[in-house]
Swiss-Prot record:
Places the protein is found: Cytoplasm
Small ATPAse domain (RuvB-S) as annotated region, ranges: 186-256
Binding residues annotated for ATP, in chain numbering: 24-25, 66, 69-71, 132-134, 175, 185, 222
Name of protein: Holliday junction branch migration complex subunit RuvB
Entry function: The RuvA-RuvB-RuvC complex processes Holliday junction (HJ) DNA during genetic recombination and DNA repair, while the RuvA-RuvB complex plays an important role in the rescue of blocked DNA replication forks via replication fork reversal (RFR). RuvA specifically binds to HJ cruciform DNA, conferring on it an open structure. The RuvB hexamer acts as an ATP-dependent pump, pulling dsDNA into and through the RuvAB complex. RuvB forms 2 homohexamers on either side of HJ DNA bound by 1 or 2 RuvA tetramers; 4 subunits per hexamer contact DNA at a time.
Gene: ruvB
Length: 342
């Protein structure tokens, strides 16, 4: 039987979260916390395009999930005074799906494609002339008698978001003049995000409570807000309605999020690499089978944090547990062979 992990520290949006995220989403560049260099650059690009009355160049936003790529797209549309059209790679199954979106765009509108690395090859190829020449090619008929009809499109901006830049085909990636990678947030930035969100939710919050939540939010705003919601529940039912350090600590212990921000699935991954595979190296598919999760989910959701925090290493031969993983789980490294990093 597959045991599903607790999902409170999963950086991907859960069902029903979109509405809350929209209510807490920053409305302007000045409201956006963190990613200072990226925001400063994009602010200049947007202002220049607006002054010239042109569409903004196509933008590719990459980085781990939950860091604010969608929020940046919304802010761009608002700053440019245009409409944002939102879709995702998996939703664009055939060329007709893309055609319907492109032909509905007004001049300078933004088309936001989340998970753009998951576009089908046919849709991706149809996107090339749309991005370069603002046209969409429609094939009429089949075989030798087939003809291509060009549909002219309004000049628009494509904003693509991806967590897996390496899965993007080079011809697609190279068609984005503006490419920015979002990085994990520091504790001070996450604290500010938590305090702002608590204020919007009408939740009194202590400084040390916000600091503790930020410290254990895996560098990800979406996780910080999710944990804030759960802490609000505990503060309301088992406390005096105020978010204190004690309330946050009690909440996260109940959610099995430890002092370093690792959850039950993180610990299962590390335990599998150490106990089942002798510390590695071991392939991602083997680890996924051992913990009962899809390998893509491990690569997108869990591994980036474990690698960044020094618990796990990705090597040409597979995943290897690092000394911090042994120490965190209380394992003796002499109990099994330690894999080579080369």
């Amino acid at each position: 039987m597959t045991v599903k992990p607790l999902r409170d520290v999963t950086p991907k949006p859960l069902e029903g979260e979109e509405r809350l995220e929209q209510s807490l989403r920053p409305a302007t560049f000045d409201d956006y916390v963190g990613q200072v260099k990226i925001v400063d650059n994009v602010k200049v690009y947007a202002a220049a395009a607006r002054q010239r009355g042109e569409s903004l160049d196509h933008v590719l936003l990459s980085g781990p999930p939950g860091l604010g790529k969608t929020s940046l797209a919304h802010i761009l549309a608002r700053e440019l005074g245009v409409t944002l059209h939102v879709t995702s790679g998996p939703a664009l199954v055939k060329k007709g799906d893309l055609a319907g979106l492109l032909t509905a765009l007004a001049p300078r509108d933004i088309l936001f494609i989340d998970e753009i690395h998951r576009l089908s090859p046919a849709v991706e190829e149809a996107l090339y002339p749309a991005m370069e020449d603002y046209r969409f090619d429609v094939v009429l008929g089949a075989g030798l008698g087939a003809q291509t009809m060009e549909m002219k499109l309004e000049r628009f901006t494509l904003v693509g978001a991806t967590t897996r830049t390496g899965l993007l085909a080079s011809p697609l990636r190279d068609r984005f003049p503006i490419q920015e990678r979002l990085e994990y947030y520091g504790p001070a930035e996450l604290k500010e995000i938590a305090v702002r969100a608590a204020r919007k939710l009408g939740l009194p919050v202590d400084e040390d409570g916000a600091e503790e939540l930020a410290r254990r939010a895996r560098g990800t705003p979406r996780i910080a807000i999710r944990l804030l919601q759960r802490a609000r529940d505990f503060a309301q039912v088992e406390g005096d309605g105020r978010l204190t350090r004690e309330v946050v600590d009690r909440t996260l212990r109940r959610l099995e999020v430890d002092a370093r921000g690792l959850d039950a699935m993180d610990r299962r991954i590390l335990a599998a690499v150490i106990d089942t595979f002798g510390g590695g190296p071991v392939g991602i598919d083997a680890v996924a089978a051992a913990v009962g999760e899809e390998s893509g989910t491990l690569e997108d959701v869990y591994e980036p944090f474990l690698v960044r925090e020094g618990y796990l290493a990705r090597t040409p031969r597979g995943r290897v547990a690092l000394p911090a993983a042994y120490a965190h789980l209380g394992r003796d490294r002499s109990g099994g062979k330690q894999g080579s990093l080369v």
